[in-house]
């Protein structure tokens, strides 16, 4: 993973983000530790969690840890807050799922207060109360970036908009265009609550894979993706095992997966950015059992071939 971060920086990609998981089938439980290691030999790439499960973390420690990454990286760290795709962290750290909403809301508010004020005064119900204590170290960046991720829940969208925080949509199924009403509502509600439109940034995160040969990419990506989806489908009633037909739709022009050769993937990225009015697009490349050397090649193609096509298109468009 450190090699991936260093390569992503070398080929000129903008950001590398790592998720927090507490399962046998995922490698990282503490993204900030890996990001700190990735900061050492990189110069430009931004380093983010994707996501930090704030509901089952201590907001003070989350801020301190990422402020440390920000110092090591000379101001390149970001936090992406979320509830997380899985619930293992709740019993693991002694939290109840019955407090799901309250934990997320209070802890998100607490870390925003920590970002705003060096000296923390806080009365908590699901968090500790703090009376005039400093939280250190402070982030290098004056307005330390905190994004909030959601799978497309309307209430979450409006809550994030009300706070004027940048939002990240996990678009991993269906037609990405279905998210347009949510994005429009986010921007409208954010402005109604007095937030400057320039701060109401929208990002999307989707799965994908790139190879020089389109057919190779599509065939190679299927089985690792199916394996992951099928595993989740055994745990969640609203998921179903992936068929080849479903996969073909997902990698097609109206699907949510970005798989193919560099030109195909670039064209599809341009399409989603334009249709949804995105400020940032993040492609989740490594998944399941894809060999490490193939993941590195995909990152290389993303940085050297896909990204230049996308950047040139929007540069020419003005």
Language model segments and positions:
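N-terminal beta1-alpha1-beta2 module of alpha/beta enzyme domains
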Residues: 1-48, 144
């Amino acid at each position: 993973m450190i090699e991936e971060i260093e390569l992503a920086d070398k080929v000129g990609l903008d950001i590398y983000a790592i998720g927090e998981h507490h399962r046998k089938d995922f490698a990282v439980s503490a993204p900030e530790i890996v990001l700190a290691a990735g900061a050492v030999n990189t110069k430009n790439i931004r380093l983010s969690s994707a996501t930090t499960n704030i509901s089952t973390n201590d907001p003070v420690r989350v801020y301190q840890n990422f402020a440390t990454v920000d110092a090591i990286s000379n101001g390149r760290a970001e936090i992406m807050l979320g509830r997380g795709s899985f619930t293992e962290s709740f019993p693991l750290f002694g939290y109840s799922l019955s407090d799901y909403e309250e934990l997320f809301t209070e802890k998100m508010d607490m870390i925003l207060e920590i970002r705003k004020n060096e000296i923390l005064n806080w009365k908590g119900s699901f968090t500790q109360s703090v009376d005039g204590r400093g939280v250190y170290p402070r982030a290098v960046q004056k307005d330390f970036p905190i994004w909030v991720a959601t799978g497309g829940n309307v209430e979450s969208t409006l809550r994030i908009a009300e706070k004027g925080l940048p939002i990240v949509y996990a678009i991993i199924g269906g037609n990405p265009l279905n998210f347009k009403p949510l994005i429009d509502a986010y921007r409208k509600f954010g402005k109604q609550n007095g937030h400057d439109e320039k701060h109401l940034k929208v990002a999307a995160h989707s799965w994908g894979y790139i190879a020089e040969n389109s057919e190779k990419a599509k065939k190679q990506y299927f089985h690792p993706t199916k394996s992951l989806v099928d595993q989740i489908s055994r745990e969640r009633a609203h998921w179903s095992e992936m068929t080849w037909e479903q996969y073909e739709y997902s990698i097609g022009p109206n699907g949510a997966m970005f798989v193919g050769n560099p030109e195909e993937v670039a064209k599809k990225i341009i399409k989603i950015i334009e249709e949804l009015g995105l400020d940032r697009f993040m492609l989740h490349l490594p998944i399941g059992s894809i060999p490490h050397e193939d993941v590195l090649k995909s990152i290389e193609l993303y940085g050297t071939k896909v990204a230049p096509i996308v950047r040139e298109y929007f540069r020419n468009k003005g």
